[in-house]
Amino acid sequence: MKALLDYSKIEKYIIYNDMTKGSFCKNAGISYSTLKNVENEKGIAVASAQKIAAALHTNLLSIIKEKKHE
């Protein structure tokens, strides 16, 4: 199963917290290529989506826009 995320919310978080994309990836425990897949609106693994949501806020699972089965 794959998830699509709203990259604009992630980008706002990165900018607001004066982070780099690399430091965000390190804090979230994801690879930079995973973040690029989010930015390019490619599906990512749900586990990675959950890591990103947890890095933003523990209750912010609403950034998952859509789930698609593959």
Question: At which residue positions do the language-model features occur?
Answer:
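Short, basic-rich loop-to-helix N-cap that marks the start of a DNA-contacting helix
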Residues: 41-54
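Short C-terminal boundary/hinge segments that cap the last helix of small helical domains
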Residues: 57-70
